[in-house]
């Protein structure tokens, strides 16, 4: 992995959606670079598999079973974590449906997971990062090419990823005023 050239020893990296896909790959790469990975996933079995793979690269992991869409659970779990140096805000999914057939349930789920949960995670982590002035952190909000261009059958996904782009830009402007990296 390319991150092996980056030294993240003694750093703590929180990854949402860590059990599968990009979140899993990021978690392993961060562990290879020396970070202690704080892996959030709804599925304990995915966290257990990730733990085995991180141990294979001699990495460290803190497993947190958590549904990022449940604000109170998320807040409670994050309160137990003392230091976060890196946030990889990755949890998300897509439910492809033609525009005229999009179900409210699907739309609400995608907005709750892809956008609202990302906002909530970022806000809670930034509060923690700002308290720790000696250890400025980095925030990576995972988006998609579909946060820049539209695609047929992906309208709600497009909407949430455009929202992530706006959130990230807004956070960058606001946090820069605090002389804090976004």
What are these regions (language model features)?
Residues 12, 19-21:
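Conserved glycine-rich cofactor-binding loop
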Residues 35-49:
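Conserved glycine-rich Rossmann-like NAD(P)H-binding loop of the short-chain dehydrogenase/reductase
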Residues 98-99, 103-111:
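Substrate-binding pocket helix/loop in short-chain dehydrogenase/reductase
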Residues 102, 150-158, 170:
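Active-site loop-to-helix junction immediately N-terminal to the catalytic Tyr of the SDR YXXXK motif
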Residues 122, 160, 168:
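Active-site helix of classical SDR
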Residues 127, 173-177:
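Alpha-helical segment proximal to the catalytic Tyr-Lys
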Residues 144:
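Residue(s) in the substrate-gating loop at a strand-loop-helix junction
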